[in-house]
């Protein structure tokens, strides 16, 4: 089946009011394809700015993280309700930097994913293996474990987009070959068909998220199970538009 092409832009902990406004303005001025879904994730202080200044109907705004409680004594956290109150409609969960630096567990990420969905947000669920895990040839075991944690608590995956990000390729300039990505994405979809059902797995978009840029994005064009990209550093640059247009 044809799944709508999806491009996510994760700004990470980068930007100021001025630079985020400039990025959004650049997207507003671009002629973007109407059949590509785009989601940008600025730092939390600039979510409302991005929402208010975005003029593109095909672009929505996401948080980079959320908590699994509605409110309370959770210093520094942000709830789905607060994210929605700022006008955003998405959140990321499970980004490798949260897993490796902040030490978030599979179960905690699953809990956050479920709570975000229950509160009406859509979710970009990030999964992927480290370089050590790749060398140990356990890529699919790791991805399956991370997905299964969510599948145990979430039955409806219609508002989840999965992003496969090989941790060894993030911010390193190293990228999996399109063939590598397709092979892994196909295996992820096959695993999902067992855990959430064949129909849901077929409909779930799986993004590639490892050092994607304007130059290498078109190389993934004919890969059947690569349904888009989760872009990091390149989303801060004009080439983000080239990535959005890479399926034209």
Swiss-Prot record:
Keywords: Gluconeogenesis, Glycolysis, Isomerase. Pathway: Carbohydrate biosynthesis; gluconeogenesis; Carbohydrate degradation; glycolysis; D-glyceraldehyde 3-phosphate from glycerone phosphate: step 1/1. One of its GO terms (biological process) is glyceraldehyde-3-phosphate biosynthetic process. InterPro entries: Aldolase_TIM (IPR013785), TIM_sf (IPR035990), TrioseP_Isoase_bac/euk (IPR022896), Triosephosphate_isomerase (IPR000652), Triosephosphate_isomerase_AS (IPR020861). It comes from the Eukaryota. Belongs to the triosephosphate isomerase family. This is Triosephosphate isomerase. It comes from Debaryomyces hansenii (strain ATCC 36239 / CBS 767 / BCRC 21394 / JCM 1990 / NBRC 0083 / IGC 2968). The lineage of its organism: Eukaryota, Fungi, Dikarya, Ascomycota, Saccharomycotina.
């Amino acid at each position: 089946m044809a799944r709508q092409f999806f491009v996510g832009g994760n700004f990470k902990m980068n930007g100021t009011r001025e630079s985020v406004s400039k990025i959004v303005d650049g997207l507003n001025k671009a002629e973007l394809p109407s059949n590509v879904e785009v989601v940008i994730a600025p730092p939390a202080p600039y979510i409302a700015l991005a929402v208010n200044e975005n003029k593109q109907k095909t672009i929505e705004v996401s948080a980079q993280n959320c908590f699994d409680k509605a409110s309370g004594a959770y210093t520094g956290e942000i709830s789905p309700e607060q994210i929605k109150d700022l006008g955003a409609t998405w959140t990321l969960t499970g980004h490798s930097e949260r897993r490796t630096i902040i030490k978030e567990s599979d179960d905690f990420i699953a809990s956050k994913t479920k709570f975000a969905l229950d509160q009406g947000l859509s979710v970009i669920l990030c999964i992927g293996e480290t370089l050590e895990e790749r060398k140990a040839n356990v890529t699919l075991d790791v991805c399956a474990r991370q997905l299964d944690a969510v599948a145990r608590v979430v039955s409806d995956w219609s508002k989840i987009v999965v992003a496969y990000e090989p941790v060894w390729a993030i911010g390193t300039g190293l990228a999996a070959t399109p063939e590598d990505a397709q092979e892994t994405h196909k295996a992820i979809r096959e695993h999902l068909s067992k855990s959430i059902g064949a129909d849901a797995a077929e409909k779930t978009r799986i993004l590639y998220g490892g050092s994607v840029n304007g130059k290498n994005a078109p190389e993934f064009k004919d890969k059947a199970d690569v349904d888009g990209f989760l872009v990091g550093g390149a989303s801060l640059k004009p080439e983000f538009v080239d990535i959005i247009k890479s399926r034209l």
